[in-house]
From Swiss-Prot:
The chain crosses the membrane at residues 12-32, 52-72, 97-117, 140-162, 167-186, 192-212, 234-254. The keyword Membrane applies. It comes from Synechocystis sp. (strain ATCC 27184 / PCC 6803 / Kazusa). One of its GO terms (molecular function) is phospholipid transporter activity. GO terms for biological process: phospholipid transport. This is Probable ABC transporter permease protein slr1045. InterPro entries: ABC_MlaE_roteobac (IPR003453), Permease_MalE (IPR030802). It is a multi-pass membrane protein. One of its GO terms (cellular component) is ATP-binding cassette (ABC) transporter complex.
Length: 263
C-alpha cells in the first residue's frame, strides 16, 4: 500500500511538472498579448516586495556577518586581510544573495500562491471564474509571475547591500579591519557582470517560484488535505528547481577563470 502511494505521488509530481512547463508557455504568451490584470499585479508586487522585505533583509544581514566571521580569522592568519571584502562580495553577489533570497520567497510567497489557488480550486472558485468569462491564467497566474519576476531582483539587490553592510560591521568591529581596505577589496573583486548575473538569476528564480506555486495550486485535488500537500510539495519543488537552475546558470555565467581583479 505504501509503495502504491509512493508511485502515485511520484506520478502526480511528474504530471504537475509537465503542467508547469505548459503553464510557463501560456503565461509568456499572455504577457506578449498584453493580457495583464494591472490591479492584481500591483497587489502581488506588494506581497512579494514590501511585505517580504524584512525577513529577506534580516536573513541577508546575518548571512553576511556569519560568512565574515568564518573567513576573516583564517584570511588574517594567512595575511590575506585585503581580500576579505572581495571574497564576501563575490560570494554574496554570485551565489548567496540570489539563492537565499529566492529560498525565503519560495517559503513565504510560493507557499501562499499554492495554498490560495489550491483553495480556490477545491472550493470551485476557479469554475466560477470560467463562468464569468475570466481566464484564471490572466487573473491569477500572470500577475504573480510578473510580480515575482520584477520584485525578486529588487529584493536581491537590497539583500546584497545589507549582507555587505553586515560583513563590513563585523570585519571592522571584531577584526579591526579598516573599512577603506574592505571597500577597496570589494571594488577590486566585483565586476559589473557579477551584479548583472545576480539580478538575472533572481529574475529566473522569481519566475520559477511563481510558476510552480501557481501550477501546483491549479492542479490541487482532495479538499483541505490536498491543499496542504500541494503547498508542501510546491515549496520543496521550488527549492529543488532553484538549486538545479542555479547550478546551470552559474556554470554558464562563471565558468571562465581568472576574471577577478586581485590588485
Amino acid at each position: 500500500m505504501s509503495d502504491r502511494g509512493s508511485r502515485h505521488s511520484l506520478s502526480l509530481w511528474f504530471q504537475r511538472l509537465v503542467a508547469a512547463f505548459f503553464l510557463t508557455g501560456q503565461v509568456f504568451l499572455h504577457i506578449l498579448q498584453g493580457r495583464i490584470n494591472r490591479r492584481n499585479t500591483l497587489e502581488q508586487m506588494n506581497m512579494v516586495g514590501p511585505e517580504s522585505m524584512a525577513i529577506a533583509l534580516i536573513t541577508a544581514g546575518f548571512v553576511g556577518m556569519v560568512f565574515t566571521i568564518q573567513v576573516a580569522r583564517e584570511f588574517i592568519y594567512y595575511g590575506a586581510t585585503t581580500t576579505i571584502g572581495g571574497v564576501l562580495s563575490l560570494s554574496l553577489t554570485r551565489e548567496l544573495a540570489p539563492v537565499l533570497t529566492a529560498v525565503v520567497i519560495a517559503g513565504r510567497v510560493g507557499s501562499a500562491f499554492a495554498a490560495e489557488i489550491g483553495t480556490m480550486r477545491v472550493t470551485e472558485q476557479l469554475d466560477a471564474l470560467y463562468m464569468l468569462r475570466t481566464d484564471p491564467i490572466d487573473y491569477l497566474v500572470v500577475p504573480r509571475v510578473i510580480a515575482c519576476g520584477l520584485m525578486l531582483p529588487i529584493l536581491t539587490g537590497l539583500s546584497l547591500f545589507v549582507g555587505m553592510a553586515g560583513g563590513l560591521v563585523i570585519s571592522s568591529s571584531l577584526y579591526a579591519i579598516n573599512p577603506t581596505i574592505f571597500l577597496n577589496s570589494v571594488q577590486n573583486f566585483t565586476q559589473l557582470w557579477d551584479v548583472f548575473a545576480c539580478l538575472f538569476k533572481s529574475l529566473v528564480f522569481g519566475v520559477i517560484i511563481a510558476i510552480i506555486g501557481c501550477s501546483w495550486g491549479l492542479t490541487t485535488t482532495g479538499g483541505a488535505k490536498g491543499v496542504g500537500e500541494s503547498t508542501t510539495t510546491a515549496v520543496v519543488t521550488s527549492l529543488l528547481a532553484i538549486f538545479i537552475s542555479n547550478f546551470f546558470l552559474s556554470w554558464l555565467m562563471f565558468q571562465g577563470t581568472g576574471d577577478t581583479a586581485l590588485g
